[in-house]
Amino acid sequence: MSVKEHNEEDIIGDELQNSRQLSIDCDSVKISLRNTYWTKDYTTGIKLFIKHMKRENDLLIKDIKFYNDFVNKFWKPTLNNLQKMEATNSMNSRLLEVMSKQFNIISTEQVERDCKIPLQELRDLNESFLREAENDLSSRYSAYIKDLVAAKEALIGCEKRVQSIYKLKKANTPVENSSSVFDNGKDSAPLTRLNFVCEFPYTLDERLKFEDCDQFMSFLQTLKGKVILEKSVFSVPGLSNQSFQGRSLIKELKKLEPRLNLSLFNIDRIGNEFIQLGIIQEYSLSFYSSKVSQFDQEKYYYWNSEVLATQESNGNAGNRKKKSYGELTHSDNEHEEKSNVSSIKTSISDWIRKVSQHDNDDCDAAGSTDMNKNEWKSLKQQLESSQDIFFSKCCQLEYSKVQLEKTIYDYCKNYSKMEDGIKRALESSNMMFQQKCEKFTDSPVCSLQEAQLPQETANADVRGFFLRDNGIPFRRWNILEASDPVDACKEISIKSEKFFCGSEINNELAALDTLGAIKIILRQIEKEPNANKVIQSWHRDIDFVRVSNLKRDLLGEFKGSKTTENTNSIITAHFFENSHSYVTNDLVGLIKLWLLELPDSLIPSNHYDDLIKAEKSLTSLCEQFPTSSLRFLQELANHFQLINSKYSLPPQTIQDLFRDNSDIDIPLAHHFVRRTGLQNPIDIKILSPTLSTFFINERTVETLQTLIANRITTATTATLTEPPTIIIKDTTAPIHSTPKPPPNDKDGHFIPRPFKTSSTPTTPERPKRKSGLFLPINVNDVPST
């Protein structure tokens, strides 16, 4: 065994032993209404909270009914009947007198005053609170959903603008070498054969993630093959008489992924995602409408053949003998250069054919495809306008989300007090009634154990700490323009960047930019001279209103920034240099909010069970974490250890941050690791000491640094070819006549426009040959290698 392996085993062994010694009691985990009914979709938790209040109200109604029946159906009729009876002799008279006196020991007026009326008043108050909460939460949730849909539509609007600009680039790029603007550099199907807009890696659901377009298309083909098609009695004109019910689609999805979340919210979300991507369309006369319908399990849909035919056409490309107009054919026997020319030719013809189908038919196959300066300026303004709308909708969505969360929290907090009052009132009325009954019986009615209120079953409700939907992360599209003095034109490119809050960290470049922003915030926290403020900020719950304001301020800086790289780290540094209105508690809250908004927790959720079983230490599991997670964990571990050393705090201070959860609603450990589905809040007993041991261990930073260095050393650097450049001419180029293809012959002869050459030397940045088509492209579209 090497010295390195021996040291690693020592670290893992010490970590396991220390975490077991630091186990916390159940009493230190506060489970209340404020941290019980939280779900990522909000509506499930709200419904369970309403159900909980109704159940409490039912307890009051039951006891009220019992006292009412006891008085009106039993005790009063008994007394009345005794008084009506006539004695036949002195013995009967004496017996009736004794019994009447004994029964009068329990006064019906006292039972109603001491037992029934207090519960009735509490019931009325509870029902009033219930109605108010139900209406208010419903209103807040409706506003949130409305803003969520508006933000999603604004995002789609931006993507369509970018997509329309990008599609123009197809006339200048071979199909084999083009890659989608939305694939983050991953290999995917060519955009010329893809009609939906999404980013890869693409997350359809927490259980359905796809690394590239091929994987996604393969999944869709499998799903399509399993969904049973039906024939309608009355077919829709213009569509084939084959459709399927939305319920059938969800059923087959569940078979493909048994752990799929089948809440109504999630089902509707997945269905709407399919509709928005153009994978399915409603089988009805709305086919002729431009309005996008909402998914409904009871409605019928049909597969979009234009999208799903992609995989089939790719698979059968080698067997096709006859090519149709605008299609790309592959032949292993053809020369490589000839294939490339064919690719360019067919891509151009395909683009012209699609453009000719638009409402504006000014440009046809024989017309000019040049774009002058004014046309490009108009497209750019349209994209900027769409981005302004998207930014506004994202800010509104953040506001409505915080208002919804604050409303849920306030009602849960207030009802928690009411619930205690209900419990005390029920116990008091039971005790009063028991005392009155014991006077009548002259003996104890029941033991103290039997007098306890009925307990709720363990699985009655979902229990879990705060969860936040990461919503729709804001992104922007930077338009880069560079002048070409030789050709008197501009080179245009488009680059996309995401705001760090709510965005995934699995993309290396985006993760490094986010890491830079997080580092700046942590350094800002470490400037705080008061150690108690730093410790209390990490211990307290998030002040969502102030932190949301800080987040929106940073979002505004991100939107208005003119930088094109590392924007998150640059705007964060600039913001805190000039703004002093936020305190340490706000900065720590922003870090916590960022952790909660990650699509997957910083410690990947698929290792949650491994940590709960405590069979492996967190350090040993780090070898299986993504490199981006290791970088952030290293930075946070370094931060906690720096706090400990800088302020000369006792060793147990950082441990207490994780272990003492008695006076907070969101345990600190919950920010770092969360289960994808339901989780038992008592798991915090294991997770808290595990994380505290991990972060305070002096060898953790060194271990993580070694793992990161090994990943960088072994990683292979992909060689990327220079993407094609697009040109925006300052003046309109002369029109070159090109013969139109015969109307009934899709294989008609196509003559490409002549290329022009530059007298300047050839360089990678300025190739000598440039296409005669002056069209904008996206620099993110790196040809696949």
Swiss-Prot record:
Domain annotation F-BAR: ranges: 31-463
Keyword Phosphoprotein: yes
One protein family per Pfam: RhoGAP
Residues in Rho-GAP domain copies: 520-702
Keywords recorded for this protein, A-Z: Acetylation, Cell membrane, Cytoplasmic vesicle, GTPase activation, Membrane, Phosphoprotein
Region (Disordered): 313-340, 732-785
Free-text description of this protein's post-translational modifications in UniProt: Phosphorylation at the C-terminus negatively regulates the activity and the polarized localization.
Phosphoserine sites (modified residues): S759
GO CC term (a single one): plasma membrane
PROSITE patterns on file: RHOGAP
GO MF term list: GTPase activator activity
Keyword RNA-binding among UniProt keywords: no
UniProt subcellular location: Cytoplasmic vesicle membrane; Cell membrane; Bud tip; Bud neck
InterPro entries for the chain: Rho_GTPase_activation_prot, RhoGAP_dom
Other information: Present with 1720 molecules/cell in log phase SD medium.
Protein's UniProt name: Rho-GTPase-activating protein RGD3
Organism: Saccharomyces cerevisiae (strain ATCC 204508 / S288c)
Lineage: Eukaryota, Fungi, Dikarya, Ascomycota, Saccharomycotina
